[in-house]
UniProtKB/Swiss-Prot annotation:
Name of the gene this protein is made from: Nup35
Protein name: Nucleoporin Nup35
GO cellular component: nuclear membrane; nuclear pore central transport channel; nuclear pore nuclear basket
Residue span, RRM Nup35-type domain: 187-268
Biological role: Functions as a component of the nuclear pore complex (NPC). May have a role in the organization of the inner nuclear membrane proteins at the nuclear envelope together with Nup154.
Pfam families associated with the record: RRM_Nup35
């Protein structure tokens, strides 16, 4: 037996050089042995360690290590539970067929990155689905001519009726002047009513009956014993009361009709009578010259400085005796 010296190796140095090199650098697929990783955030995940001896594993252990390696790569691809040998082999054959030996090419957080990317894709699809109803709404919105900015019916009739004091029938440009010019005449026409349908001899009786509706300001009778007359009330409310007697029977045997007066000659009677009077009147006199403001203010300032004489102020006498007294006493 050879004696043993301190510092000398037991075996020859050349036979044990492979103990100091990782097996995956030498291309040896049998040096991978799995063991549990207690620091892994996921359950059922195995870590990879490399054996120091190329021949220290049995064939059964090699098969088990290969299955564990495939299970590891399948779990990193998205599996969260324990996977069998058949399912892990299928997943490994689809994704990691070219990484049977060597160190792992995926980190511990690669699966977390894949999971974080997947909800973003789902959210992107959800946004596309949400945008599609908006696009259909916009298309239906632009198909309506009343809302399109360049369409002929650019102003909606309902909005015009709500926002415009002229009503929905008045156009924004053309109908404005007509409505303004006829505004005063329409107000006068609200006070006038037309009463018709009565016999010519019952005109006074019908007029007496309509006095209960309000104060009658003016009456225009029909020519040649006609069966109508125009009555003007002092207010719109009184004329509305008279309109309630339309198609009503008066005095038991006379049915009358009442409506708004549409005869422009009657409605504009006051305006027509007032226009000639204005034309016949005196011509306008030429305006007088405007006094300068500076002169007027100067005169007012001088009046304040003038002292008005008062009667009660004593005056010095200028008689002969007064002059003699001044010479004697030196006053």
């Amino acid at each position: 037996m050879e004696p043993m010296n301190l510092g000398s190796p037991v075996n020859s140095p050349g036979s044990n050089q492979t103990q100091y090199l990782p097996p995956f650098l030498l291309g040896d697929p049998q040096g991978i042995t799995p063991h549990k990783n207690t620091l892994s955030p996921k359950t059922g995940r195995s870590n990879i360690s490399f054996a120091t001896s190329p021949g220290g594993s049995s064939p059964h252990e090699l098969n088990r290590s290969a299955l564990s390696t495939r299970t590891l790569f399948a779990a990193q691809g998205g599996a969260h539970t324990a996977v069998g040998a058949n399912s892990s082999t299928t997943a490994h054959g689809q994704t990691h067929s070219h990484h049977q030996t060597g160190p792992p090419t995926q980190g511990l957080f690669d699966s977390l990155r894949e999971q974080s990317v997947t909800p973003k894709k789902k959210n992107h699809l959800g946004m596309l689905q949400l945008q599609s109803p908006n696009q259909s709404y916009q298309s239906s919105y632009h198909t309506n001519d009343s809302f399109a900015p360049g369409a002929p019916n650019a102003i909606n009739a309902s909005m015009r009726a709500l926002c415009s004091p002229l009503g929905a029938t008045a156009s924004p440009a053309g109908g404005l002047g007509t409505s303004v010019t006829t505004g005063g005449n329409s107000r006068l026409s609200d006070f006038w009513v037309t009463i018709f349908g009565f016999p010519p001899g019952a005109g006074s009786m019908v007029l007496q009956h309509f006095t209960v509706c309000g104060t009658i300001v003016d009456v225009v009778h029909a020519p040649q014993n006609g069966n109508w007359m125009y009555v003007r009330y002092s207010s719109r409310i009184e004329s509305d009361k008279a309109l309630n007697y339309n198609e009503k029977i008066i005095a038991g045997n006379v049915m009358v009709g009442v409506s708004r007066c549409t005869d422009r000659s009657v409605i504009d009677k006051e305006n027509i009578g007032s226009v000639p009077n204005a034309e016949i009147g005196d011509p306008p006199t030429s305006p007088s010259a405007i006094r300068p403001f500076s002169q007027q203010s100067y005169k007012l300032a001088r009046k304040d400085n003038i002292i008005s004489p008062q009667k009660d102020v004593p005056q010095k006498s200028s008689g002969l005796m007064d002059k003699a007294m001044d010479l004697i006493f030196g006053w």
